[in-house]
Amino acid sequence: MTQYKPSPRPNYHEPTPLPYASTARHLWGDAEAGQVADWIYVSSAQIHQIVWGLAPGGSFRHSAEFRTIFGADLIYYVLSGTMVIANPEHGEVQRVLPGEAAFFRRDTWHHAFNYGTDPLRVLEFFAPPPSQGTSGAYARTKPLLAHSRYTDDRALGRWPMERAAIEQTQTITVVRDQDLLWRFEDGQLLVGLLCSTEHLTAGKLLLPPGHRSGRLCHPGDKSLYLTQGTLHVFCPDKPDAPNWFELHEQDGFFLPAGSCHEFHNLTGQPVECLFGVAPTYC
C-alpha cells in the first residue's frame, strides 16, 4: 500500500519568478485512486498553485489513503485536453474544455478523467492552502466515501424544464469566458474573474501589445501562470535587485501580500495570464 505523504510546499518571502523548468515535481496517488503528476509552483501560507496532469485515458478517484475532499475553495482551469469532473457522492458530472474552469468549495468529493486523446493539464488554485491543514490532513477527518456514482438520476424527467432548480443543487460550477466577471483595473488592465470568495479570488488578465497596467497591490498573496505571450513584471518597492522580471508561457510568479507590482507587454503579441489571490483581493 502506498501511504499518503504531503506534497512539497515551496514558499517565498519576496517577489519571485517561478520558471516551469524549476517547479517541484510530485506524484500523487496509489493503485486504487490513480496517479496524478503535479508541477508545484508555490504553496505559501495563503495560496497553493500547481499544474496537474493525466495521460489520455487517465483518471483519479480516491482511496482510503488518498481522499479527494478538501477544506478549501478550488479552481481547476483546463490548459489542454478534456476534463470530465464528477462529484461521486451525488452523481453530478461536468465536462470542461481548454480555457474553461471548474470551481467548487470545501467538502466536495471529486474525481477527474481525461476524456480525450491529448494530455490533460490543469492549473489549480487552492485556498486556504495545504499549509493550513486543508488537504490530506483534512480529508482524513472525513468519512470514506464507500460508493461512487456518476449519474444524477434526480434530474431525469425534469430537464431542461427545471434547469434552474437542478443547477441550484450542483456543487461544481463550470466557468466559461461568457461567465467571467470583468473588471477594468484603473482603466488600464482588463481582468476577468473566475471566482471570488472570502478565501480565493482567481481570474485571467489580458494585456494587449504595448500596454501596461497601473500599480497593483493586494492584501493577499498573489500567484501567476502565463498562458500566452511574454509578460514583464516590475516590482518597484523590492529593495534588492532584480526588480524587473520576464515571464514566458508556462512560467509562474509569486508576490507576497502587499507586494506592489506592474505588468508590461513590450511585444507585438497579446498576453494572457491566470492569477490567484488569497485570501483578500482588495
Feature-to-residue mapping (PLM):
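Double-stranded beta-helix
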Residues: 5-8, 111-170, 262-282
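Short strand-connecting beta-turns/loops that link adjacent beta-strands
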Residues: 46, 88-90, 117-118, 198-199, ...
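Short acidic-glycine-tyrosine-enriched beta hairpin
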Residues: 89-106, 237-257
